[in-house]
Amino acid sequence: MLERYKTILEGGTGEITEKKSRFIASVRLVESEEEALAFIEETKKKYWDARHNCYVYSVGLNREYTRCSDDGEPSGTAGRPMLDVILGEDLYNVAVVVTRYFGGILLGTGGLVRAYSKAVQEGLKNSKIIEKQFGITLEVTTDYTGIGRIQYIAGERKIPVLDSEYTDKVVMKLLVPAEEEGAVRKAITEGTNGRAKLQKERELYFAVLNGEVHLFDQ
């Protein structure tokens, strides 16, 4: 299991032109090989009149399903360079299709490699990329004297507070990276002189993008 990994939150498209040939990159999050293949077929139907629809996908946190295709371009000039970009960006669970409308001018081997690589980079630039972290939700129950200390610890460690409930006591739900669980438990226990009750609720992946918290099962 990866403690952290980069993936797509929202796919995008990017387009470049090289010697009158148009290269359109379509990017999508995929969490199974079936999803990847369906996306490829969907894109081929959308751009049915294009000369080439080259693709790459990498599915699984151990890259169990990683494939690429030149789709009629000279061997090694499209799919492999596209895969190199994905691996270089360290992205998981992603599929990219680069559609080429031929402009009548041959690009040569080096030109094709550069064009397909650049198209993928452009597509990724127009996508929302996140880093998912493996973590837990930690329920913290305390009296009112402990609130300030817990809020300070959460703020100092940049730990999101998902929910707070105020009755005769305070119940806060914290989103804690798994690698920091022990340190956070210790800090809260010491900071409240042992008055806070800590309960681990669930394990999950999460990401924070532009201050917004996103929760995931995987």
Where are these regions (language model features)?
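C-terminal regulatory domains involved in ligand/effector binding and gene-expression control
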Residues: 1-77, 199-209, 213-218
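Structural motif
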Residues: 26, 53-55, 93-96, 137-139, ...
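Short amphipathic alpha-helices in soluble, non-transmembrane regions
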Residues: 150-155, 183-192
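Terminal, non-globular segments
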Residues: 174-183
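Short glycine-/aliphatic-rich beta-strand segments at the starts of folded cytosolic domains
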Residues: 128-144
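Active-site beta-strand/loop microenvironment that shapes enzyme catalytic pockets
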Residues: 78-126
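A common structural junction motif
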Residues: 47-50, 157-162, 189-197
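Short amphipathic alpha-helix segments
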Residues: 141-159
